Amino acid sequence: MAAGLFGLSARLLLAAAATRGLPAARVRWESSFSRTVVAPSAVAGKRPPEPTTQWQEDPEPEDENLYEKNPDSHGYDKDPVLDVWNMRLVFFFGVSIILVLGSTFVAYLPDYRMKEWSRREAERLVKYREANGLPIMESNCFDPSKIQLPEDE
């Protein structure tokens, strides 16, 4: 079973390498269990000859290596002076303005979902009810005398 699976996968790999024009190593594998020999087919090794092309260097390379001219380049500009100033501006605004002013803004945001206000209001009502001798909580949330129910039919 294992020899059959290995043989199938080896053939598939060799066929894929041959169709893509990749160099493939010839594989010969012998199983110690069943004396099965797995070797690539002779068809997989035959490839059409590659077309010959003349090698010509590009007279004007498109990508210019900035590190050859300025080894301390930060990648903002080709000019070393502008590159340093752009780097300083980015870090100043990134660190000073965004982090410092951003955290200050978040710290002074208003009460989210009014949690602090509801706590203060509950403490105020508890003090008022204790001072006037009223129960802290009533069983009825609404005054039953003010509720108007529909008449029975």
Curated annotation (Swiss-Prot):
The chain crosses the membrane at residues 89-109. Accessory subunit of the mitochondrial membrane respiratory chain NADH dehydrogenase (Complex I), that is believed not to be involved in catalysis. Complex I functions in the transfer of electrons from NADH to the respiratory chain. The immediate electron acceptor for the enzyme is believed to be ubiquinone. Residues 66-77 have a biased composition (Basic and acidic residues). It is found in: Mitochondrion inner membrane. Its main location: mitochondrion. InterPro entries: NADH_UbQ_OxRdtase_ESSS_su. GO terms for cellular component: mitochondrial inner membrane; respiratory chain complex I. It holds the Pfam family ESSS. Residues 40-77 are annotated as: Disordered. The lineage of its organism: Eukaryota, Metazoa, Chordata, Craniata, Vertebrata. Belongs to the complex I NDUFB11 subunit family. This is NADH dehydrogenase [ubiquinone] 1 beta subcomplex subunit 11, mitochondrial. Signal peptide: none annotated. It is a single-pass membrane protein. Complex I is composed of 45 different subunits. Interacts with BCAP31. Keywords: Electron transport, Membrane, Mitochondrion, Mitochondrion inner membrane, Respiratory chain, Transit peptide, Transmembrane, Transmembrane helix, Transport. Residues 1-29 form a transit peptide.
